[in-house]
Amino acid sequence: MSKSGDNQPVDRYLRRQILGEGTYGVVYKATDTKTGKTVAVKKIRLGNQKEGVNFTALREIKLLKELNHPHIVELIDAFPHDGSLHLVFEYMQTDLEAVIRDRNIFLSPGDIKSYMLMTLKGLAYCHKKWVLHRDMKPNNLLIGENGLLKLADFGLARLFGSPNRRFTHQVFATWYRAPELLFGSRQYGAGVDVWAAGCIFAELLLRRPFLPGSTEIDQLGKIFQAFGTPVPSQWSDMIYLPDYMEFSYTPAPPLRTIFPMASDDALDLLAKMFIYDPRQRITIQQALDHRYFSSSPSPTEPGKLQIPASKGDALEPKASEQNQHGNSPAVLSPPGKMRRVMGPEGFT
C-alpha cells in the first residue's frame, strides 16, 4: 500500500460509467491511466464477516491469481479503499446471455460450436487445477471485442479433490443446477459444472433458457419432463441423497423432439452431459474430445463471431410474453441473478 499522501491505487483507474449494480457492490467501466487500457472494476463493500462478503471476495482473488488461461477472465489488480475492496479485471464488451437474447444475431451451428469449445476449454483448465466453478451460466461467460469467451465470477468457486470434503448444495442459479444438488448432495465433483455447461449448450441451440424452474421442486420437474424420471438402474445412489423425494414416473421423450435442428453429434454430446448419475456423466475433457467438435462444420473463428453492439440492445421482453415451456411466463434470467454469497459458517 502507498504511504499517506502518495497516490493511492484507486487513483490509477479513471471511472467512466457504471456497468451493473448488485447487493454487495457495483461494477464500473474505467480507464487504466498507467496503460491507457479500458478495465472493469468490481467495487465490493466490506461488510462484517458474518455476511460472508470478505471471505467470498478473498477466495475469488486467491483463485484468479492462480488461474491463467485464454478463456478465464484476467484479474489485473486488487486493493482495499474507503471501506470497499476493488477488483480490477480486463474489460469484456458483453456476455453470452446478451448474444443468445439478441435476435439481430444469427447463431450458426459453427458459432454455437465455437462458444461451447471456448466454454469447455476454460472449464477443463479449471478442473485440471482442481477448481469447481459452481456458478456457470451465460451471463458469467464474458465476451471481448475479439470474440474470445472467458469464464468469470469465481466467487462461488472451490477447490475439490478430497473424497470426504463436503460442500453446500446451494450453488449455481437454479436453472443450471444439477439434479444431485437439487436432491441435497453435499459431496460432489466436476459433474455439477458439466451439467450447467449442458444447460448453456441447450440454451445456445434453443435461444431461450432450457429448464427455467421457478423453485427447486419445479426445477426437478422440468428436468424429469425433459429427460424422464430417473430410476435406480440409471442412478442407484439418488435414493440416499439428503433431500431425495420420489416423483411420479415420466418417460423420456426423444431429444430430437426438443432440439429438432441439432445435429446427431450435438444431440449425442448433450445426452452425455445430462446423464443423471454424476459418476457416469461425461467429463469436460471427454466432451472436448467428442466427435461433435471435429465434425463439420468447424467452429467459427472467434474474431468472426457476431456480438451485440452494446449489452441490452435488441433484447426480448422479460415477462410479458409466453415462452415455449407451456404457459410459464417468459423469463430470461434466473431468479436472483446476482450470485449467492455464502457465509463463513457451515458448508462451503
From Swiss-Prot:
Annotated catalysed reactions: L-seryl-[protein] + ATP = O-phospho-L-seryl-[protein] + ADP + H(+); L-threonyl-[protein] + ATP = O-phospho-L-threonyl-[protein] + ADP + H(+); [DNA-directed RNA polymerase] + ATP = phospho-[DNA-directed RNA polymerase] + ADP + H(+)
Binding site for ATP: L19, G20, E21, G22, T23, Y24, G25, V26, V27, K42
UniProt-recorded name of the protein: Cyclin-dependent kinase D-2
Subcellular location: Cytoplasm; Nucleus
A single Gene Ontology CC term: cytoplasm
Phenotype for S162A: Reduces phosphorylation by CDKF-1 by 30%
Domain Protein kinase, residue spans: 13-293
Record-listed Phosphothreonine modification sites: T168
CDD domains: STKc_CDK7
Predominant cellular place of this UniProt entry's protein: cytoplasm
Effect of K42R: Prevents autophosphorylation
Function: Forms a stable complex with cyclin CYCH1-1 that phosphorylates human CDK2 and the C-terminal domain (CTD) of the large subunit of RNA polymerase II.
Transmembrane segments: none
Phosphotyrosine, modified sites: Y24
Quaternary data: Interacts with CYCH1-1. Binding to CYCH1-1 activates CDK kinase.
Stretch list, region Disordered: 293-348
Positions of modified residues (Phosphoserine): S162
Organism (species): Arabidopsis thaliana (Mouse-ear cress)
Processing and modification events after translation: Phosphorylated by CDKF-1 at Ser-162 and Thr-168. Phosphorylated by WEE1 at Tyr-24. Autophosphorylated.
Top-level lineage group: Eukaryota
PANTHER family named among the record's database cross-references: CELL DIVISION PROTEIN KINASE, CYCLIN-DEPENDENT KINASE 7
